[in-house]
A protein has these predicted regions:
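Long, low-complexity, Lys/Arg-enriched
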Residues: 1-76, 89-301
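Periplasmic-binding protein-like
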Residues: 77-81
Protein backbone atom coordinates (compact mmCIF):
# COMPACT_ATOMS: atom_id res chain seq x y z
CA UNK A 1 0.00 0.00 0.00
CA UNK A 2 1.27 3.46 -0.92
CA UNK A 3 0.77 5.92 1.96
CA UNK A 4 1.29 9.64 1.49
CA UNK A 5 1.91 11.73 4.60
CA UNK A 6 0.93 15.36 3.96
CA UNK A 7 1.92 18.41 6.00
CA UNK A 8 -1.18 20.59 5.91
CA UNK A 9 -0.76 24.33 5.43
CA UNK A 10 -3.37 27.04 5.02
CA UNK A 11 -3.47 26.63 1.22
CA UNK A 12 -5.07 23.35 0.09
CA UNK A 13 -3.70 22.96 -3.45
CA UNK A 14 -0.17 21.83 -2.37
CA UNK A 15 -1.84 19.02 -0.40
CA UNK A 16 -4.34 18.14 -3.11
CA UNK A 17 -2.34 17.83 -6.33
CA UNK A 18 0.39 15.43 -5.08
CA UNK A 19 -1.99 12.74 -3.74
CA UNK A 20 -4.19 13.01 -6.82
CA UNK A 21 -1.15 12.64 -9.07
CA UNK A 22 0.59 9.90 -7.07
CA UNK A 23 -2.68 7.97 -6.61
CA UNK A 24 -1.87 7.16 -2.99
CA UNK A 25 -4.15 4.50 -1.50
CA UNK A 26 -3.93 6.06 1.97
CA UNK A 27 -3.46 9.71 2.93
CA UNK A 28 -2.40 10.92 6.36
CA UNK A 29 -3.03 14.62 6.94
CA UNK A 30 -0.83 16.18 9.62
CA UNK A 31 -2.52 19.37 10.79
CA UNK A 32 -2.28 22.01 13.52
CA UNK A 33 -4.79 24.23 15.31
CA UNK A 34 -4.66 26.76 12.48
CA UNK A 35 -4.95 24.24 9.63
CA UNK A 36 -7.64 21.87 10.93
CA UNK A 37 -10.33 23.37 8.67
CA UNK A 38 -8.10 22.99 5.61
CA UNK A 39 -7.41 19.36 6.56
CA UNK A 40 -11.12 18.59 6.84
CA UNK A 41 -11.81 20.12 3.42
CA UNK A 42 -9.09 17.99 1.85
CA UNK A 43 -10.47 14.92 3.64
CA UNK A 44 -13.77 15.40 1.79
CA UNK A 45 -11.96 15.00 -1.53
CA UNK A 46 -9.30 12.34 -1.00
CA UNK A 47 -10.03 8.68 -0.36
CA UNK A 48 -8.99 6.85 2.82
CA UNK A 49 -7.82 9.83 4.88
CA UNK A 50 -6.52 9.83 8.43
CA UNK A 51 -6.07 13.07 10.37
CA UNK A 52 -3.32 13.51 12.94
CA UNK A 53 -2.66 16.68 14.95
CA UNK A 54 1.00 17.48 15.60
CA UNK A 55 3.00 20.26 17.20
CA UNK A 56 4.01 22.86 14.57
CA UNK A 57 6.99 24.37 16.40
CA UNK A 58 8.54 21.76 18.74
CA UNK A 59 10.88 19.66 16.59
CA UNK A 60 11.10 16.66 18.93
CA UNK A 61 7.34 16.48 19.41
CA UNK A 62 6.78 16.88 15.66
CA UNK A 63 9.20 14.03 14.90
CA UNK A 64 7.52 11.77 17.45
CA UNK A 65 4.08 12.67 16.08
CA UNK A 66 5.13 11.76 12.55
CA UNK A 67 6.80 8.52 13.65
CA UNK A 68 3.57 7.44 15.33
CA UNK A 69 1.76 7.20 11.97
CA UNK A 70 4.53 5.53 9.97
CA UNK A 71 4.07 1.77 9.47
CA UNK A 72 6.92 -0.51 8.49
CA UNK A 73 4.81 -2.64 6.14
CA UNK A 74 3.68 0.31 3.99
CA UNK A 75 5.45 2.27 1.25
CA UNK A 76 5.50 5.74 2.78
CA UNK A 77 6.08 8.98 0.88
CA UNK A 78 6.21 12.38 2.56
CA UNK A 79 4.72 15.50 0.97
CA UNK A 80 6.60 18.33 2.68
CA UNK A 81 5.11 21.22 0.68
CA UNK A 82 2.78 22.52 3.40
CA UNK A 83 3.03 22.96 7.15
CA UNK A 84 5.58 24.96 9.12
CA UNK A 85 9.33 24.86 8.54
CA UNK A 86 9.72 22.81 11.73
CA UNK A 87 7.19 20.28 10.41
CA UNK A 88 9.16 20.03 7.16
CA UNK A 89 12.42 19.42 9.03
CA UNK A 90 10.72 16.78 11.17
CA UNK A 91 9.27 15.03 8.12
CA UNK A 92 12.67 15.08 6.41
CA UNK A 93 14.33 13.51 9.45
CA UNK A 94 11.76 10.72 9.63
CA UNK A 95 11.90 10.14 5.87
CA UNK A 96 15.68 9.88 5.93
CA UNK A 97 15.65 7.55 8.93
CA UNK A 98 13.18 5.26 7.14
CA UNK A 99 14.85 5.67 3.73
CA UNK A 100 11.54 6.95 2.36
CA UNK A 101 10.91 9.27 -0.57
CA UNK A 102 9.61 12.77 -0.09
CA UNK A 103 8.05 15.20 -2.57
CA UNK A 104 7.73 18.96 -2.87
CA UNK A 105 5.28 20.82 -5.11
CA UNK A 106 6.41 24.06 -6.73
CA UNK A 107 3.36 26.03 -7.90
CA UNK A 108 4.91 29.35 -8.82
CA UNK A 109 4.89 30.61 -12.38
CA UNK A 110 1.61 28.84 -13.32
CA UNK A 111 3.33 25.45 -13.56
CA UNK A 112 2.77 22.65 -11.06
CA UNK A 113 6.15 20.91 -10.73
CA UNK A 114 6.55 17.94 -8.41
CA UNK A 115 10.08 17.28 -7.17
CA UNK A 116 10.73 13.76 -5.86
CA UNK A 117 13.68 13.13 -3.55
CA UNK A 118 14.80 9.55 -2.92
CA UNK A 119 17.68 7.90 -1.05
CA UNK A 120 18.72 6.14 -4.27
CA UNK A 121 19.32 9.48 -6.05
CA UNK A 122 22.64 10.53 -4.50
CA UNK A 123 21.17 10.35 -1.00
CA UNK A 124 18.31 12.79 -1.75
CA UNK A 125 20.55 15.33 -3.50
CA UNK A 126 19.35 14.74 -7.09
CA UNK A 127 15.55 15.07 -7.26
CA UNK A 128 13.50 14.07 -10.27
CA UNK A 129 11.04 16.63 -11.64
CA UNK A 130 7.63 16.08 -13.21
CA UNK A 131 4.97 18.51 -14.35
CA UNK A 132 1.58 17.63 -12.89
CA UNK A 133 -1.13 17.42 -15.58
CA UNK A 134 -4.71 18.64 -15.38
CA UNK A 135 -6.27 17.16 -12.22
CA UNK A 136 -8.74 19.71 -10.86
CA UNK A 137 -11.82 21.43 -12.23
CA UNK A 138 -13.64 24.51 -10.96
CA UNK A 139 -15.96 22.54 -8.68
CA UNK A 140 -13.10 20.62 -7.06
CA UNK A 141 -11.14 23.85 -6.63
CA UNK A 142 -14.05 25.48 -4.81
CA UNK A 143 -14.63 22.39 -2.69
CA UNK A 144 -10.98 22.42 -1.59
CA UNK A 145 -11.11 26.07 -0.52
CA UNK A 146 -14.63 26.64 0.83
CA UNK A 147 -16.76 24.85 3.45
CA UNK A 148 -19.59 24.95 0.91
CA UNK A 149 -21.01 27.13 -1.86
CA UNK A 150 -23.91 27.50 -4.26
CA UNK A 151 -24.33 29.11 -7.67
CA UNK A 152 -26.90 31.73 -8.64
CA UNK A 153 -25.94 32.48 -12.24
CA UNK A 154 -26.13 36.04 -13.54
CA UNK A 155 -27.34 39.01 -11.48
CA UNK A 156 -31.13 39.26 -11.34
CA UNK A 157 -33.59 42.02 -10.48
CA UNK A 158 -35.03 41.56 -6.95
CA UNK A 159 -38.12 39.32 -6.89
CA UNK A 160 -37.93 38.90 -10.65
CA UNK A 161 -36.71 36.53 -13.35
CA UNK A 162 -35.21 39.42 -15.31
CA UNK A 163 -31.50 40.04 -15.52
CA UNK A 164 -30.15 43.37 -14.35
CA UNK A 165 -28.15 45.40 -16.86
CA UNK A 166 -25.07 44.13 -15.04
CA UNK A 167 -26.39 40.57 -15.33
CA UNK A 168 -26.81 41.03 -19.08
CA UNK A 169 -23.18 42.14 -19.30
CA UNK A 170 -22.11 39.11 -17.23
CA UNK A 171 -23.98 36.87 -19.67
CA UNK A 172 -22.34 38.59 -22.66
CA UNK A 173 -18.91 38.04 -21.12
CA UNK A 174 -19.55 34.33 -20.51
CA UNK A 175 -20.97 33.92 -24.02
CA UNK A 176 -17.75 35.45 -25.35
CA UNK A 177 -15.42 33.02 -23.57
CA UNK A 178 -13.82 30.33 -25.71
CA UNK A 179 -15.40 27.07 -24.47
CA UNK A 180 -12.56 25.09 -26.06
CA UNK A 181 -10.01 26.88 -23.88
CA UNK A 182 -11.84 27.54 -20.63
CA UNK A 183 -14.06 25.87 -18.07
CA UNK A 184 -16.09 28.26 -15.91
CA UNK A 185 -18.96 28.75 -13.47
CA UNK A 186 -20.88 31.98 -12.85
CA UNK A 187 -22.49 33.44 -9.74
CA UNK A 188 -20.54 31.72 -6.94
CA UNK A 189 -21.81 32.32 -3.39
CA UNK A 190 -19.78 30.85 -0.50
CA UNK A 191 -22.06 29.62 2.28
CA UNK A 192 -21.82 30.96 5.82
CA UNK A 193 -20.56 34.45 4.97
CA UNK A 194 -23.85 36.21 4.22
CA UNK A 195 -23.46 38.66 1.34
CA UNK A 196 -19.84 39.45 2.15
CA UNK A 197 -18.46 37.56 -0.84
CA UNK A 198 -20.05 37.17 -4.25
CA UNK A 199 -17.89 35.90 -7.09
CA UNK A 200 -19.19 36.66 -10.57
CA UNK A 201 -17.01 34.10 -12.35
CA UNK A 202 -14.55 31.30 -11.64
CA UNK A 203 -12.56 30.18 -14.67
CA UNK A 204 -9.91 27.53 -15.37
CA UNK A 205 -7.63 27.20 -18.37
CA UNK A 206 -8.20 23.70 -19.75
CA UNK A 207 -5.18 21.43 -19.71
CA UNK A 208 -3.93 23.07 -16.51
CA UNK A 209 -4.75 23.35 -12.81
CA UNK A 210 -4.68 27.16 -13.02
CA UNK A 211 -7.82 28.88 -11.79
CA UNK A 212 -8.92 32.51 -11.68
CA UNK A 213 -11.88 34.49 -10.42
CA UNK A 214 -13.42 37.58 -11.97
CA UNK A 215 -15.67 40.43 -11.02
CA UNK A 216 -17.64 41.69 -14.03
CA UNK A 217 -18.80 45.31 -13.83
CA UNK A 218 -20.37 47.69 -16.35
CA UNK A 219 -18.64 50.73 -14.92
CA UNK A 220 -20.03 54.18 -14.11
CA UNK A 221 -18.82 57.77 -13.89
CA UNK A 222 -18.00 57.48 -10.19
CA UNK A 223 -16.50 54.01 -10.75
CA UNK A 224 -18.44 52.63 -7.79
CA UNK A 225 -19.01 49.28 -9.52
CA UNK A 226 -15.33 48.66 -10.30
CA UNK A 227 -14.36 49.77 -6.78
CA UNK A 228 -16.80 47.27 -5.31
CA UNK A 229 -15.41 44.63 -7.66
CA UNK A 230 -11.88 45.27 -6.41
CA UNK A 231 -13.04 44.96 -2.80
CA UNK A 232 -14.71 41.63 -3.60
CA UNK A 233 -11.57 40.29 -5.29
CA UNK A 234 -9.31 41.34 -2.42
CA UNK A 235 -11.59 39.65 0.13
CA UNK A 236 -12.12 36.50 -1.96
CA UNK A 237 -8.36 35.90 -2.20
CA UNK A 238 -7.80 36.00 1.55
CA UNK A 239 -6.39 32.83 3.12
CA UNK A 240 -9.77 31.92 4.65
CA UNK A 241 -11.39 31.77 1.20
CA UNK A 242 -9.74 31.12 -2.19
CA UNK A 243 -6.22 32.01 -1.16
CA UNK A 244 -3.09 33.28 -2.80
CA UNK A 245 -2.86 30.83 -5.72
CA UNK A 246 -6.01 32.23 -7.35
CA UNK A 247 -5.55 34.70 -10.22
CA UNK A 248 -7.96 37.66 -10.11
CA UNK A 249 -9.56 39.67 -12.91
CA UNK A 250 -11.65 42.84 -12.97
CA UNK A 251 -13.61 42.86 -16.24
CA UNK A 252 -15.47 46.00 -17.34
CA UNK A 253 -16.85 47.64 -20.46
CA UNK A 254 -15.64 51.10 -19.41
CA UNK A 255 -12.14 52.55 -19.65
CA UNK A 256 -11.01 52.72 -16.03
CA UNK A 257 -9.14 55.61 -14.47
CA UNK A 258 -5.46 55.60 -13.63
CA UNK A 259 -6.35 55.58 -9.93
CA UNK A 260 -8.37 52.36 -10.21
CA UNK A 261 -5.68 50.72 -12.34
CA UNK A 262 -2.98 51.60 -9.82
CA UNK A 263 -5.12 50.24 -6.98
CA UNK A 264 -5.68 47.00 -8.89
CA UNK A 265 -1.98 46.69 -9.66
CA UNK A 266 -1.12 47.11 -5.98
CA UNK A 267 -3.29 44.07 -5.22
CA UNK A 268 -2.00 42.07 -8.24
CA UNK A 269 -5.41 42.17 -9.92
CA UNK A 270 -5.53 42.01 -13.72
CA UNK A 271 -7.81 44.60 -15.35
CA UNK A 272 -9.54 43.86 -18.65
CA UNK A 273 -11.38 47.07 -19.51
CA UNK A 274 -12.78 49.01 -22.48
CA UNK A 275 -14.55 45.93 -23.88
CA UNK A 276 -16.83 47.76 -26.36
CA UNK A 277 -20.14 46.36 -25.11
CA UNK A 278 -23.16 47.09 -27.29
CA UNK A 279 -26.09 47.70 -24.94
CA UNK A 280 -28.78 47.44 -27.63
CA UNK A 281 -28.05 43.88 -28.76
CA UNK A 282 -26.17 42.88 -25.58
CA UNK A 283 -23.04 41.68 -27.34
CA UNK A 284 -19.33 42.43 -27.29
CA UNK A 285 -17.49 43.42 -30.46
CA UNK A 286 -15.25 40.77 -31.99
CA UNK A 287 -12.03 42.67 -31.31
CA UNK A 288 -12.96 42.92 -27.63
CA UNK A 289 -13.83 39.21 -27.53
CA UNK A 290 -10.34 38.39 -28.78
CA UNK A 291 -8.82 40.75 -26.23
CA UNK A 292 -10.83 39.15 -23.39
CA UNK A 293 -9.85 35.57 -24.24
CA UNK A 294 -6.21 36.37 -24.96
CA UNK A 295 -5.75 38.29 -21.71
CA UNK A 296 -7.29 35.58 -19.54
CA UNK A 297 -5.29 32.85 -21.27
CA UNK A 298 -2.09 34.85 -20.86
CA UNK A 299 -2.61 35.25 -17.11
CA UNK A 300 -3.57 31.61 -16.55
CA UNK A 301 -0.76 30.15 -18.69
Amino acid sequence: MKTLINLIGEQPIPNLLPPLYLKSQKNILLYTDTTEKAANRIKRILSDCELKKIDPYDLTMAINGIKSVVKADEETIFNITGGTKIMSVAAYEVAKENKSKFVYLQSEGRRSLLFTYSPEASDYRKPSKEEIPELVNCELYLKAHLPDYYTTGYSMEPNSNRLTSGGEFEEAICDSLDKQKFEFLSGIRPKGVGNQIEIDLIIRLKGTNNVGIAEIKLGDKMEEGPKKGLDQLVMAAEREYLGTYTTRFLITQSNLSKQIKELASAHHICIIDDLQYEFRNKTIKSTAVTKLNDRIKEKLS
